[in-house]
């Protein structure tokens, strides 16, 4: 009988510890950012820069079209050597435009770098506020509603990375 009562108490304590819920919150990062004047100003500045660069590229593309149209009009009058020279000029200009596009809009281009310099400090400010909010109010996990950022905050006690590494090493 004593064993049965002892087992019941242990079982109840085990169930109680399993049922302690984690405090979870959801934050819509996109909504937060869209409602920050700093962020919208940065986006406006980035849009203006991108538009200016796109116009520059369009001007250069128009030049290539003009070069090609002129080449087509003169084609019957050109020697083989001149044809080759004109074709090479057009190809070189097209390559120059692609390089310009890449330098401005590529993955490591000027627009990406400008976005990093303008937006990253704002994002860090938001993530800092989320960390502070979660810590002060005892949240264990905070998720991004939009899903683009995934987990925004997690209590360190739920990080089992080292446990998994130890298990793999054994």
Task: Annotate each predicted stretch with a short phrase.
Residues 22-170:
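Amphipathic, charged alpha-helical segments and their helix-to-coil junctions
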Residues 1-24:
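Bacterial Sec-dependent N-terminal signal peptides
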């Amino acid at each position: 009988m004593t064993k049965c009562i002892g087992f019941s108490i242990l079982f109840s304590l085990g169930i109680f510890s399993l049922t302690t819920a984690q405090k979870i919150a959801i934050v819509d990062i996109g909504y937060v950012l869209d409602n920050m004047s700093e962020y919208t100003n940065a986006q406006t500045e980035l849009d203006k820069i991108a538009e200016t660069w796109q116009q520059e590229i369009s001007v250069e593309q128009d030049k290539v079209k003009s070069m090609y149209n002129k080449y087509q009009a003169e084609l019957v009058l050109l020697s083989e050597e001149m044809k080759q020279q004109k074709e090479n000029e057009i190809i070189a200009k097209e390559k120059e435009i692609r390089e310009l596009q890449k330098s401005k809009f590529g993955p490591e281009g000027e627009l990406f770098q400008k976005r990093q310099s303008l937006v990253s400090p704002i994002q860090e400010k938001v993530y800092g506020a989320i960390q502070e909010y979660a810590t002060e109010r005892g949240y264990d996990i905070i998720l991004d509603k939009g899903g683009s950022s995934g987990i925004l905050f997690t209590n360190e006690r739920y990080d089992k990375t080292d446990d998994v590494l130890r298990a793999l090493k054994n």
